[in-house]
C-alpha cells in the first residue's frame, strides 16, 4: 500500500463510519442484559479496550493484514457484498444442516458455530462470533471467512487465544472487531444486540441492508440449538429470551421459529 492510499484510508477510518449508528434501544438492551445477569460493564470495557489496543499496533500479532487500514478496506468489501447480495440468509444456532445447492444464488451470514451448518464455506460472507464456536469457527477461520469478532467481559482470554492461533495461519481471516460497551473505541464498532444471532442482524442492519430483505434460519428460543457452544442450557434459554427482545426491537421477531 502506498503512502497516499494509507493516509486516505486512515482518514476514512477516523472520519467516516462504515456502520450506521445503532438505535438507542439496541444499545440500551446491552445494559439491561448486564443488569439482568449481574454483569459489570467495566469488564466489557476492559476486554474491548484491550482488543482495541492490540489491534492498533503495527502488524497486530505479527500480521500486517490486521492493521486498521486493511481491516477498514476488508469491511468496506464485506459491506458491499452484504448489501448487494441477491438473497441473504442469516444462520442461527438452531438451524438444520444447509446444502448450499438447495439455495441457488444465496449468500450466508452465520452466527458463530452455526457456520458449521453450511456445507460450502465459499458462500459464507462472514461469521459473527464471540469466539465460542469451537471447531466450526476454527474451520471457517482456516478457510478465510471474514470473522466479526466480539469482545465482552467474559471472553478476554478466549478472543486473545483465538487471534494468536489465527495469526499463525498462512492466510489468516479478515477481522472486524465489535464490542458491547457504552464507550467509543478506535477500530471497533458497537452495532447493538447481545447474542451472536441478534448481533448478526444488528450488524447487517448497521451496514445498511434492510432486514425486510433477508431470511433467517435456525433462530429459536424454545431449545438450545445444536450449533451452540458448550453452555448451561437454562442460562442459555435466558439469553435467548434477550435475543427475542433484541429481534423485537429490530422489527424482525417474525423470523423466530415458533
Language-model segments: which ranges?
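A generic structural motif
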Residues: 104-108, 212, 252-253
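Acidic/Gly/His-enriched mid-domain segments of enzyme catalytic cores or analogous surface patches
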Residues: 66-68, 81-85, 106-107, 113-209
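N-terminal donor/sugar-recognition subdomains of glycan-related enzymes
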Residues: 2-88, 95-101, 224-258
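Buried, small/hydrophobic-residue-enriched core segments of structured protein domains
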Residues: 183, 216-218, 235
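Glycine-rich anion-binding loop/nest that anchors nucleotide
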Residues: 89-95, 112, 196-197, 205, ...
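A structural signal for short, well-ordered beta-strand segments and their strand-loop junctions
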Residues: 176-177, 213-218, 255-258
Amino acid at each position: 500500500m502506498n503512502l497516499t492510499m494509507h493516509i486516505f484510508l486512515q482518514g476514512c477510518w477516523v472520519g467516516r463510519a462504515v456502520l450506521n449508528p445503532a438505535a438507542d434501544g439496541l444499545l440500551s438492551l446491552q445494559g439491561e442484559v448486564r443488569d439482568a445477569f449481574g454483569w459489570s460493564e467495566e469488564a466489557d470495557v476492559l476486554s474491548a479496550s484491550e482488543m482495541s489496543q492490540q489491534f492498533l499496533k503495527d502488524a497486530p500479532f505479527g500480521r500486517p493484514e490486521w492493521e486498521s487500514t486493511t481491516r477498514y478496506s476488508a469491511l468496506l468489501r464485506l459491506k458491499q457484498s452484504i448489501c448487494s447480495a441477491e438473497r441473504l440468509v442469516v444462520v442461527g444456532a438452531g438451524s438444520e444442516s444447509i446444502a448450499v445447492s438447495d439455495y441457488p444464488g444465496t449468500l450466508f451470514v452465520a452466527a458463530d458455530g452455526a457456520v458449521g451448518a453450511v456445507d460450502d464455506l465459499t458462500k459464507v460472507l462472514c461469521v459473527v462470533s464471540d469466539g465460542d464456536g469451537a471447531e466450526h469457527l476454527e474451520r471457517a477461520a482456516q478457510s478465510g471467512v471474514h470473522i466479526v469478532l466480539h469482545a465482552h467481559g467474559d471472553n478476554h482470554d478466549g478472543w486473545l487465544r483465538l487471534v494468536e492461533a489465527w495469526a499463525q495461519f498462512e492466510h489468516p481471516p479478515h477481522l472486524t472487531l465489535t464490542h458491547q460497551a457504552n464507550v467509543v473505541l478506535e477500530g471497533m464498532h458497537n452495532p447493538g444486540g447481545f447474542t451472536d444471532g441478534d448481533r448478526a442482524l444488528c450488524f447487517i442492519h448497521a451496514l445498511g441492508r434492510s432486514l425486510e430483505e433477508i431470511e433467517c434460519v435456525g433462530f429459536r428460543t424454545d431449545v438450545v440449538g445444536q450449533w451452540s457452544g458448550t453452555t448451561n442450557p437454562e442460562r442459555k434459554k435466558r439469553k435467548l429470551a434477550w435475543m427475542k427482545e433484541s429481534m423485537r426491537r429490530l422489527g424482525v421477531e417474525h423470523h423466530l421459529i415458533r
